[in-house]
Amino acid sequence: MSEAGDMGLVVVGAAGRMGQTLIRAIHTIPGARVIGAVERADSPHLGKDAGELAGIGIINVPIGDDPLPVFAKADGVLDFTTPASSVEFAGYAAQARIVHVIGTTGCSADDNARIAAAARHATIVKSGNMSLGVNLLAVLVEQAARALDADDFDIEILEMHHKHKVDAPSGTALLLGEAAAAGRGIALAGNDVRSRDGHTGVRKTGSIGFATLRGGSVVGDHSVILAGTGERITLSHHAEDRAIFARGAVKAALWARGKKPGLYSMRDVLGLS
């Protein structure tokens, strides 16, 4: 692959499962190349070649623990880490005036506010899911929620992930919940039901329910159920390989290159806004 004009990308969390998947994805997509790899200061993988660790051979990019030097020479950063880390990296991306693609989930309102503040100087693409299929599903969910009256159809969102996932509901489930709420013309906050236990009483009209399953090695299953009297519609997406998220993240970075600073979503990237 020619390096002339390629977008130089840094992968943070480079030794993790998603980090290695991102490195492999960048290696296969024209127009992008890995120029930096960052890990925690206590990572046993510091100093190793990022490409060799990801199984694509030596690419002469050692894994380091200081993001500042590599951000300074990069065009963008791909980030599927933790909320606290993503907030920190957003600040560094703002200093470097580069693209920051965030696939991290579990961010709090304060985390999101700090990321939005960084977007005054960085071009940030943030999404709970980077795949084309899920973002198209979100559009369909919004349309269905708009077309089907809340008095007639209840909305429930069911998701399942592998046993190692630490946040719930998933970022994708919340993305779909936001889409359903937008279709209904309401805010998700205050209308979401995330747990049911004991005597819960009857279902509140217009609420949006979430159910979470964890187990095995499931990459990600999501279903949005619109349940009416005598009929039920289910809109679903099943992720079979986390590489779909990595490819979407690289596509987002390439799309964001040259865009004005701001906070964008995958709907913007895919032209679904």
Curated annotation (Swiss-Prot):
Signal peptide positions (record): none
MF annotations from Gene Ontology: 4-hydroxy-tetrahydrodipicolinate reductase; NAD binding; NADP binding; oxidoreductase activity, acting on CH or CH2 groups, NAD or NADP as acceptor
A single cellular component GO annotation: cytosol
Keywords of the record: Amino-acid biosynthesis, Cytoplasm, Diaminopimelate biosynthesis, Lysine biosynthesis, NAD, NADP, Oxidoreductase
EC number: 1.17.1.8
Alphabetical list of CDD domains matching this protein: DHDPR_N (cd02274)
Binding-site residues for NADP(+), renumbered to this chain: 40
Family, as annotated: Belongs to the DapB family.
HAMAP family (alphabetical): DapB
Chain's role: Catalyzes the conversion of 4-hydroxy-tetrahydrodipicolinate (HTPA) to tetrahydrodipicolinate.
Protein name: 4-hydroxy-tetrahydrodipicolinate reductase 1
Species of the source: Mesorhizobium japonicum (strain LMG 29417 / CECT 9101 / MAFF 303099)
Source taxonomy: Bacteria, Pseudomonadati, Pseudomonadota, Alphaproteobacteria, Hyphomicrobiales
